[in-house]
Amino acid sequence: MLNLRAIARQAMLDRGFIVSLPEAAQHELNNAAEPRFDSAGIRDLTSWLWSSIDNDDSRDLDQIEFAAKETGGTRIYIGVADVDWFVRANSALDDAAQHNTTSVYTGVQTFPMLPERLSTDLSSLNEGEKRLAVVTEMLIADDGRVTESTMYSAIVQNKAQLTYDAVAAWLDEEPGAKTPQRLLGNGDLQVQLKMQDAAAHLLRERRHEAGALTFQTTELRPVVTPDGTVVDLQAHVHNRATRLIEDLMIAANEVNAGFLEQHGLPSIRRVVKTPARWDRIRALAALMGGNLPEEPDAVSLEAFLQQQQRTNPAHFAELSLSVIKLLGRGEYMMKVPGEEAPGHFGLAVQNYSHSTAPNRRYADLLAQRLVKAAQVRTNSPYSVDELSALATRCTQKEDDANKVERLVKKCAAAAMLRSHIGQQYEAVVSGINADGAWVRITHPPVEGTLEGAAKHLDVGHRVHVRLVSVNPERGFIDFALISS
């Protein structure tokens, strides 16, 4: 019987991850305790109607939100768990987190960057618990501009732990959708969510005017019985609530980067460089009647994507996958104040960091430490060389984590497809190199190797393929080309 949990654990080890907490870190964890809430200068915001929105099964809650309408716009507050209070720089817990740099979500088992006693308890913004947080405050004007912003430490309390699917159904007023339990009879919380949704929409509209790219993406999660049998592959797509949180977090990340720049501290930026394969993106657009300029231009690409989403929605997920592949991966880079650095091409922002998930990503924990240094006007706790090395480490381990997650999902998909050998599918070429090509079918949304790939194929080409073999233990899914 296929044991996906064993496969996931071995994949973690093969990629150099720590899967068991080292003894010294365990000793520190055993002595971890609730923080004292009497520190001078820390604001007490526990009376506010904070709420969180996350996945149904999320237990590591990194951020909560609050909104207040005022003249000139909506003031948004993002409270991010103060993980640094528990995980001090250069401690054994910090060393373990720095080694892995990220939580890994395989769909059958989560390998948290920080032990669960911290990430799902003491440093998680769980409902009803008083917690320390680093708050990003920003005023969103009616045209979507962030006209004021600051950051500070505070005591907060999550009043309502909500989920993406339930909030999205409620916001969209879907027929038959049940009002989330926390919203029943709670008019103030309903007003809160609608204010946050409206502010997020303004932010999103302004970013898309600047060239932020519209995509339709799908996350595949295996459904496994208690005995480890794969019974289904569920596709989860972004909805209104995920976009709400995403838009607020993007704005908070921009504020974080600007805050450190303003205070003269170096930072770790999240960048997606100008795409090297713009020529192929242009060629794809031309096949669909689009006309992109010779030089990379996010505004033109976004206009084309929106037009395709309206006129050809059935194939927009395919197009999204192809363009995402051609844009290239994101990476972390150290930035010194005053120096130019690449921006994030896909989000159409120049100054961007990761800062809102310190329980899950080490880059965010580093950002939190830098912000706290800026708040008390001290020097950076890291040298430029140290930050540069840590940025490289975070990029490398993120790539490793993606490969672990992808392998486990491919093993699950191979198990599901075992009875479909010989079946034919419509597919799109999702990757290509000197060794061959990869294709992705739509139902289920699974990627596999294309045997004997023709040299004329490139990312985005539609092909007709036959499933010829699978190996669930190794995650191999092989297709043969029928026509292109």
PLM features: what roles do these ranges have?
Residues 1-451, 455, 459-460, 470-477, ...:
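Electropositive polyanion-binding surfaces
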